[in-house]
Design a protein with these regions (language model features):
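Membrane-embedded transmembrane alpha-helical bundles that form the catalytic cores
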Residues: 8-308
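Short, exposed "boundary/linker" segments that immediately precede the start
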Residues: 1-5
Length: 308
């Protein structure tokens, strides 16, 4: 179980054990479901164990697919040439810098249970929230870079996990670029199956209601995965409802927006405004991720908008 402000304690032994076994569970479910569906490639026991407990990705992902992983594993290791060594080393150094310089520095001023109750200035509360938003990004993406760099040194090309998520113009694109392998896993093994199940019901369900149920349920489950607490539940529901609202809003305004954005300047206005709005929506959600109490979290939200 994770607690609030988890990213600042990400090196604790209990947390590493929790994360490691949760990622093992993802890999086990992936292989079991694909075996049942007849999609699992033929692998021997040593290959399977290597995939499940592959040490660079054990504690924080990314969540690789076994068919892609085995393909790399079976390639004869030709040693390290200059290009591979440089690329892997560069990725490793970038990850270390992100985690231990940028993220750990931001942690000094990032939102937490202590300063959330001590700071009453709206301006400084926004600074704390921004600091936490970037701390968690550089912390997590830094660990991913470290994992990718180490894996590349031993001949395994793990999948990317982050692609500038804070520069995306809507919440759907944010989740397609934040912890991408987790999003893909939940889409494949939870979202898509329950969507098919709802469509096969004898009693038809409206498309908006189906989208609401599937998106909220998926994000709530992702929240539970981080920890069975009210704050993680609220965080999951926040994103589930946000995804649903974006879906409905996009369907309603797509034609009008396309008509209005007839010039590159107007397209830039839409894109930049979308990026700013999406980032702030995500940043407000991080408040429930950073803090351990719903009451404290809501008080911070109110103070951010000048309501004391």
């Amino acid at each position: 179980r994770l607690q609030g402000d988890w990213s600042s304690d990400v090196c604790s032994s209990d947390l590493l054990v929790y994360l490691g076994f949760s990622y093992v569970a993802f890999r086990l479910i992936h292989t079991i479901r694909d075996k049942q569906a007849g999609r699992l490639p033929s692998v021997d026991l040593s290959e399977y164990i290597t995939y499940v407990i592959f040490f660079p990705a054990f504690t924080a992902g990314p969540i690789d697919k076994i068919e892609r992983f085995i393909k790399d594993l079976r390639q004869p290791f030709a040693g390290l040439n200059t290009e591979i060594f440089f690329n892997a080393g560069q990725r490793l150094i970038i990850g270390l810098f992100k985690k231990f310089v940028i993220a750990d520095t931001l942690a000094l001023i990032a939102l937490n249970d202590t300063n959330a109750t001590q700071v009453n200035s709206t301006f400084w509360l926004w600074i704390l929230v921004y600091a936490y938003a970037f701390q968690i990004y550089f912390d997590f993406s830094g660990y991913t870079d470290i994992a990718l760099g180490i894996a590349k040194l031993i001949g395994i090309n793990l999948p990317e996990n982050f692609s500038s998520p804070y520069l995306k113009p809507n919440l759907t694109q944010f989740w397609n670029n934040w912890h991408m392998t987790l999003t893909q896993w939940f889409r494949a093994y939870f979202f898509n199956p329950i969507t098919r199940g709802l469509r096969s019901w004898q009693k038809p369900m409206s498309m908006p209601m189906m989208i609401l149920l599937t998106q909220v349920a998926t994000m709530a489950l992702i929240g539970f995965w981080h920890g069975v607490t009210w704050n993680f539940t609220i965080w999951g529901l926040w994103h589930g409802l946000g995804l649903f609202i974006h879906n409905r809003w996009n369907d309603f305004t797509k034609a009008k927006a396309a008509e209005w954005a007839s010039t590159s300047f107007r397209q830039s206005i839409l894109s930049v405004s979308g990026i700013i709005f999406t980032f702030h929506f995500v940043a407000l959600g991080w408040i429930f991720f950073a803090l351990s109490s719903p009451v404290t979290s809501w008080n911070v939200v109110l103070k951010l908008f000048g309501v004391n």
